Amino acid sequence: MTYISQSDIENVYGSANVAAWSDLTGGDTADSTRITASITYAEHYVENLFRASQYQVPFASGASGYDTQLVDWMSAIAGDWLYRSRGVRRRISRTAVDVGDGTGLTSETIARVRQEMGAALSGKIRLDAALKSNPMAEGPSCVF
């Protein structure tokens, strides 16, 4: 099931960044294979995170499409995957560290996404998504 597209990722990070981050040759031509891989990763990540929640997974599309917050989260995660998986390294004090070390271009966006997903999982915010008929059926249980 596909929830997001390249244009959704571009809405979060910009088309120039998505093209540059997806092109491992150092150019600025979007690599559709890597973009598809980032979409697959992001969609599976969010689905797996919500699988044991009160929400039905896969998520159901409403009359106006998928919940805009879900689309934003998946798009942000897909863009972060593209950014972190570029294989680019930088030097600091003669030690190579990953560019995606928490100081990268996507770190603030991902911090926001994690906070919002945590709020949805804890019930502090409610998504426009179908709920399971029995949310505890797949969650942990205790028998005495």
Please provide the spans of the model-predicted regions.
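Short loop/turn elements at secondary-structure junctions
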Residues: 76-144
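Ordered, amphipathic secondary-structure segments that act as subunit-interaction surfaces
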Residues: 48, 52-53, 67-89
